[in-house]
Structures are given as C-alpha cells and as structure tokens.
C-alpha cells in the first residue's frame, strides 16, 4: 500500500473512533434506533478499514503483538462458533474491533510517522465529546440512565491521545474540564480513574521530561497542586451538594452497587460448567445471554470475570498476558524516559479499575481510544524510534528520534527556551 493511501486510511479510522463515541453518547441519551444504527455502522466501518489496512500492508510490517491480538480475535470467534454463540452482528461490533484497532495502530506506528492533522482532529473530537457528555450527565437528575452516564467515560478515555498530540495548555484545560464532568456525573469509578490517572501521568511526565536538578521542585509543585485541587474539589462538592464523597466512602459497604452479588452468581454458574467450557469458555457474551442475574440480562461488571466465563481460563490467561505486556512496556518506557511513558502510565488506571469493576475488554467502546494510544505508543517504541538492535541501540534510538510537534507545541518550546 502506498504511503498516501495508508495515511488516508489512518485518518479515516481515527475520525471514526470519535464518530463512534459521538453516536454512542447520543444513543444512550434517548435510545434512538437511528443513533444505534449509526453507531453500529461506524464500528463495522472501522473494523473493515483496519482489516483492509492490515491485509494490504504486507507481512513484513506486522509485529508479534499485532499477530497475538489477531490470534485472540480468531480464538474468540472459534469458541463462539463452537458454542453456538456466534451472534451476528454484535460479535463483530463488541468482540472484534478493539484488538484489530490495537494491532492496526501498532503496525502503522512501527514503520510510519503519524500525520500532524491528528492533533487538530483530537482537539475537535474532544470538544465534541465533552459537549455531548453534558446532557448525559444532566439526565440523571430526571431519570435513572446508567448507560448515558457510562458513555461519558469517553471523556477520560481520550485524554491520553490529547496528551500525545496536543500542547500542554490545551491538555491542562481539557483535563480540568474532564475532572469537573466526572465529578458531576457522581460515578465513583470515573472519578477514581481521572484523579489517579492524572496524578500518575503528572509524576511520570516530570520524571521523563525534567532535568534531575528540577525534578524535586516539580514533584513538590505537583503535590502542592494536588492538595489545592482537593481543597477546591471539596468546596465545590459542598457548594453543589454533590454526594460523591459519600458514594466513595460506601464503595465497599454497598457491595459495589450490587456487583458482588452478580459476581457470586456468575462464579456459581462457572463452577457448575463442564471442564471444556471452564477451559475454553461458553462463547461470546454468554454471561449476558445465558446467566440470569436478578431475573434480567446483564454483563458481569467485571471484565476479567466476564472473559473467564465467555472464553474460559485460556482466554482469561491471554487477556492477563496482554495486560502484563502493556504494564511491562510502560515500565520500560519510564526507565528509558520515553516520550509516551506518561500516557501509558495514565492508561493503567482505566485498564485496572474498569477491568475489575466495570466493562473494558468485553466491549469495543471505552477501550477503543485507549487501544489507539497503546498501539501508537508501543508501536513507535518498538519500531521506528528504535531502529538499532540491542538495548544500547534502543536507548540511542530513543535519544535520536525527532518528533515534529504541532504549531502550539513549537511556540511553547520557544517560550520555554527564551525563559
């Protein structure tokens, strides 16, 4: 595939990632069939473009991680077919997209530079997501709509891409906006993810980007800023009469809003399953379709437990191995002070929290923008940024690699140099 065509497909896929978030936010606001149709069409179009991009790119551009992700997709499809759980089109909307997106961006970033337009697309897309999240948050004061609030998680899911492509001032502005939106949503998991993720991002960012003589001062400023933000947050909570603190304090006493009961029922069903289904699983979304919790169909609210029931212990081990690869890559980037280490560090919070208390690997929703970031960061780290062989070559490659920043980033650097 020619360079221009590959870049065009990349841009179209990146735009579709935002379109998927837009349509998802609108669908859960009023459950309109039109928005659901547009959402499904966007996801299927995204998957088709990623598959075509991978097929036409040639085998030489594919790395171990991308092949592993594709193997995981085939495993999901095979198990689902054998267990008569090959649900069309939902299996191609929920199960297939996120590994394929991860693999596509990983392979692309290994051998290609990213177009500068992705920064502008990120700002426009993030603006739209934050604006569309406002009515989803406000609706909770009139009717109970958990899906509408869950869709607002796209706000923090796109933050690592914002940090990756945009200037610090723009990133800081959107970070404050996302923290405020998640605070108003009263969603405990979202609040923990944003606060913890931003804190970890800040710490790693200082370690990676600051000289050793300035690092201690920057750490002190981060802690001081965190304390000030906490005080202002408490004042805002009291002023607006929000009960987020009460909900955080009750995160264990209320059984995770009924999650522990759901987990117990699923584990009982898993224990009663035949050995082959324990090892290889019951198939796509079997928890939703086969396990009745409280007489209604629902997911496990635990991505790892959901994966174990749907795809067995073997499938769970594959997901855990992938998580270990991501954690290992993050630690390597931090050790080598790689430019994308802070974004990878941020992503550990949504991956960890949502995997044990919500939805993550079983649905291609909130995970999609995070997979884009993982693919770009890990692909560039293992590919064109590290053309030389060996650990010494890798370190040298990371120091020699030059990144062309956006105009706003260039102006910031000039101001820092002049200061």
Q: Language-model features: where?
A:
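Aromatic-anchored transmembrane helix interface
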Residues: 36-45, 63-78, 84-107, 126, ...
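Hydrophobic transmembrane alpha-helices and their immediate junctions
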Residues: 3-7, 57, 313-352, 385, ...
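Flexible juxtamembrane loops connecting transmembrane helices in multi-pass membrane enzymes
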Residues: 213-218, 231-265, 289-291
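Long extracytoplasmic/lumenal interhelical loops at the membrane interface
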Residues: 253-311, 321
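Alpha-helical transmembrane segments of multi-pass inner-membrane proteins
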Residues: 98-140, 146-207
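Hydrophobic alpha-helical segments of polytopic membrane proteins
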Residues: 2, 11-12, 159-238, 317, ...
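Transmembrane alpha-helices of multi-pass inner-membrane enzymes
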Residues: 344-356, 360-407, 419
